[in-house]
Amino acid sequence: MTRDEIEKAIIRIFTDQFEIVNPGLDDDLREVHEFDSIDAIELLREIEILLGVQLAREDKKAAMDIRSINQIVDYVVRLDGKTE
């Protein structure tokens, strides 16, 4: 997937699953949209579905400090590169 395709998919997940419409790419999701740890776990599951893989524990731990859409997209780009 290209970065643009991943970005669109992540934004669609936020709209469909979390009812966060048009999030700013650099918004602090925790502060601006009250995105919490339960949401983060759900997002990781959606990323697994998107990529068609089960994430390793290390990959999940690496996601815990992510706070913005841009950071999520960077994370998924790295994961997508690992699965190819």
Question: What positions do the PLM features span?
Answer:
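Phosphopantetheine-dependent thiolation modules in NRPS/PKS and related acyl-activating systems
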Residues: T2-R45, I49-E84
